[in-house]
Amino acid sequence: MSTNAIAVLRGDTVSGIIRFKQDKEGLPTTVTGEVKGLTPGLHGFHIHQYGDTTNGCISAGPHFNPYNKTHGDRTDEIRHVGDLGNIEAGADGTAHISISDQHIQLLGPNSIIGRSIVVHADQDDLGKGVGAKKDESLKTGNAGARVACGIVAIGAAS
């Protein structure tokens, strides 16, 4: 039996619903959903450490990084567990999400249930920033302000 989770994203002008599904511990987790109200283009998309939104999305803390690695792309070998790359909003401000990720888990000791998912204002540079932006790139991907977030909660069986 698979495990399901859901996050309802809220921000000043951005909202969405993200669903997670994992069939068995150690297998990839599928992430699907829709985010509305974004500016057209790419936006950083990450799992953050805490499921705390008491002070808006800033309370979510840093990217979920249980192995103490540097920031990277979703497909990179070296990355935070919470690094999910970018989502792309079309001209209507809507991003449709459909990914499978081996690193985020709903089951086991590094489960993302109870943590938060955050959409950022800017494109994530995927840890490839240079010059004055390099240090921040290796932590956050220079993805900018947090425009929406939600807590990853246990979802109903599908």
From Swiss-Prot:
Zn(2+) binds at residues 63, 71, 80, 83. Its cofactor is Cu cation; Zn(2+). It is found in: Cytoplasm. Its main location: cytoplasm. It comes from Onchocerca volvulus. Keywords: Antioxidant, Copper, Cytoplasm, Disulfide bond, Metal-binding, Oxidoreductase, Zinc. InterPro entries: SOD-like_Cu/Zn_dom_sf (IPR036423), SOD_Cu/Zn_/chaperone (IPR024134), SOD_Cu/Zn_BS (IPR018152), SOD_Cu_Zn_dom (IPR001424). Cu cation binds at residues 46, 48, 63, 120. PANTHER family: SUPEROXIDE DISMUTASE CU-ZN -RELATED. It comes from the Eukaryota. Disulfide bonds join 57-149. One of its GO terms (cellular component) is cytoplasm. Destroys radicals which are normally produced within the cells and which are toxic to biological systems. GO terms for molecular function: copper ion binding; superoxide dismutase activity. It holds the Pfam family Sod_Cu. It catalyses: 2 superoxide + 2 H(+) = H2O2 + O2. SUPFAM superfamilies: Cu,Zn superoxide dismutase-like. Its EC number is 1.15.1.1. Homodimer. Gene3D superfamilies: Superoxide dismutase, copper/zinc binding domain. Binds 1 copper ion per subunit. Binds 1 zinc ion per subunit. This is Superoxide dismutase [Cu-Zn]. Belongs to the Cu-Zn superoxide dismutase family.
